[in-house]
């Protein structure tokens, strides 16, 4: 958990050079309720259609949606589909499209007809020329790669066998990358893994792996054995076999094979899941992840992708929610930063008829006195909001040596308590603004205050609420704890 969190800030600093076969994906959704009288074929009553960037372009979209920068090099025809792809990719501020135009071939376009009700693909129609790029076009692609390579942190080759990744382009890209100390990830299509010799990582799916190794790949042990032989052929550091519902198996040259099971999710569409895996691996490895962290992140990314319709991209927030423990996320979601929006929470709770309570404090070092007040406050309401003084507010109230813990740490400790439903950080000296916004049914403070001394008591009373004073536990205060710690006492 902590490793992923530590790596996340580095992701926006990474740049991935992605090279591969670009496609325009179109999805036609409709209802199927009858068979054609002209032939034994279902009739789809088309209701809507969507277009998206597919193939290696979807890898680029995933890289950008994760927050990294991507320079994408691909091939299009001189047609509407190619212009649509150029325009669509250019709209993403994190993607720099470098597209070579070949008027002699159409832009690869795939149209899928999908039953809306059953989320079932009925038919796919392809417009494409899968032949390798001509020598002249190939040279343009290679020139583009060599120009962009020095600025990249990692290289990703996405091979759909549509003509971009010729043997010469692959060879020149890998050789140039190795000279510059850049790692190269290849999502291969050819069963001849020797084409990708010298790459850092190959990511075939199970079918591709079986074809390349002539292995049944029925177990992690069998995959590991066949993978090591394939790694000798490809002279690569690692090989990852994606296996859909079976999960993923990573074999590294130095170390044991690692298998991770697939996340249990409802599969809506597998289109582009492999693109997501490749993108997550590239971004995580570029950011400094080790093999294990990168593998688990890619596995989580695949789970998010297959739970979406169409050609899916995965955001860093979605990846984070899938990777991090539920309890960690649940606590984090309880925290509202200073100036944040409380309205959605308040509206939801009021719609349910919940009695909302409020208390506040600095909570610099949580102690039994705090816990008693919070527990009693929660017992007096259905949902408890805790107002938390920001670091600046604490310094003004307690002096320059406080707080001992910053506001984020204090908020996370409070949010982890079952008694607390929401933590709202405020910058002012008092929580009057928060109380005025929340209008709690019950306002709770420790018993060392009188009712008239409690900030916001007038607001609460004017709205029909009550002020509840809780007897404090003697001998417990943050100030005394800090003083005792400074004096070396326990």
From Swiss-Prot:
A single Gene Ontology MF term assigned here is: phosphotransferase activity, alcohol group as acceptor
Give the enzyme's EC designation. Answer: 2.7.1.167, 2.7.7.70
Matching entries from InterPro entries are given as: Bifunc_HldE, Carboh/pur_kinase_PfkB_CS, Cyt_trans-like, PfkB_dom, RfaE_dom_I, RfaE_dom_II, Ribokinase-like, Rossmann-like_a/b/a_fold
For this protein, what reaction is catalysed? D-glycero-beta-D-manno-heptose 7-phosphate + ATP = D-glycero-beta-D-manno-heptose 1,7-bisphosphate + ADP + H(+); D-glycero-beta-D-manno-heptose 1-phosphate + ATP + H(+) = ADP-D-glycero-beta-D-manno-heptose + diphosphate
Any one GO cellular component localisation term in the record: cytosol
Region: Ribokinase, residue numbers: 1-330
Instruction: Report residues binding ATP.
Output: 205-208
This protein is called Bifunctional protein HldE
Q: Which organism is it from?
A: Rhodopseudomonas palustris (strain BisA53)
């Amino acid at each position: 958990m902590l490793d992923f969190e530590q790596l996340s800030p580095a992701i926006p600093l990474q740049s991935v050079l992605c090279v591969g076969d670009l496609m325009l994906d179109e999805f036609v959704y409709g209802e199927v309720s009858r068979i054609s009288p002209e032939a034994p074929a279902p009739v789809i009553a088309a209701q809507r259609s969507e277009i998206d960037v597919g193939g290696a372009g979807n890898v680029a979209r995933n890289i950008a949606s994760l927050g990294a920068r991507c320079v994408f090099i691909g091939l299009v025809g001189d047609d509407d589909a190619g212009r649509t792809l150029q325009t669509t990719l250019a709209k993403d501020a994190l993607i720099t499209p470098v597209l070579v135009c070949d008027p002699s071939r159409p832009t690869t376009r795939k149209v899928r007809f999908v039953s809306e009700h059953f989320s079932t693909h009925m038919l796919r129609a392809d417009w494409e020329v899968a032949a390798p790029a001509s020598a002249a076009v190939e040279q343009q692609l290679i020139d583009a790669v060599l120009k962009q390579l020095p600025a990249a942190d990692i290289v990703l080759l996405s091979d759909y066998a549509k003509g971009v990744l010729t043997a010469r382009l692959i060879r020149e890209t890998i050789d140039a990358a190795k000279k510059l100390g850049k790692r190269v990830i290849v999502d291969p299509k050819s069963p001849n893994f020797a084409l990708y010799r010298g790459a850092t990582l190959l990511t075939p799916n199970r079918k591709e792996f079986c074809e390349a190794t002539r292995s049944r790949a029925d177990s992690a042990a069998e995959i590991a054995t066949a993978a090591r032989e394939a790694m000798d052929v490809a002279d690569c550091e690692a090989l990852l076999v994606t296996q859909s519902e079976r999960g993923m198996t990573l074999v590294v040259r130095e170390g044991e094979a690692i298998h991770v099971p697939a996340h249990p999710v409802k599969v809506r569409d597998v289109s582009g899941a492999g693109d997501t895996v490749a993108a997550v691996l590239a971004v995580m490895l570029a950011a400094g992840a080790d093999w294990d962290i990168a593998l688990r992140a890619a596995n989580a990314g695949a789970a998010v992708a297959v739970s979406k319709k169409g050609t899916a991209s995965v955001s860093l927030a979605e990846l984070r929610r899938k990777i991090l423990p539920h309890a960690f996320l649940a606590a984090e979601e309880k925290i509202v930063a200073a100036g944040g929006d409380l309205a959605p929470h308040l509206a939801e709770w009021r719609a349910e008829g919940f009695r909302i309570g409020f208390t506040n404090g600095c909570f610099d070092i949580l102690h039994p006195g705090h816990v008693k007040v919070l527990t009693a406050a929660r017992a007096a309401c259905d949902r408890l909001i805790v107002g938390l003084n920001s670091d600046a507010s604490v310094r003004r109230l307690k002096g320059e040596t406080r707080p001992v813990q910053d506001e984020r740490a204090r908020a996370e400790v409070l949010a982890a308590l079952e008694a607390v439903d929401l933590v709202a950080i405020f910058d002012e000296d008092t929580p009057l603004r928060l109380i005025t916004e929340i209008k709690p049914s019950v306002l709770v403070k420790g018993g060392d205050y009188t009712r008239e001394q409690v900030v916001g008591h007038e607001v609460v009373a004017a709205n029909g609420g009550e002020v509840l004073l809780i007897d404090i536990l003697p001998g417990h205060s943050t100030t005394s704890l800090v003083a005792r710690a400074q004096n070396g006492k326990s």
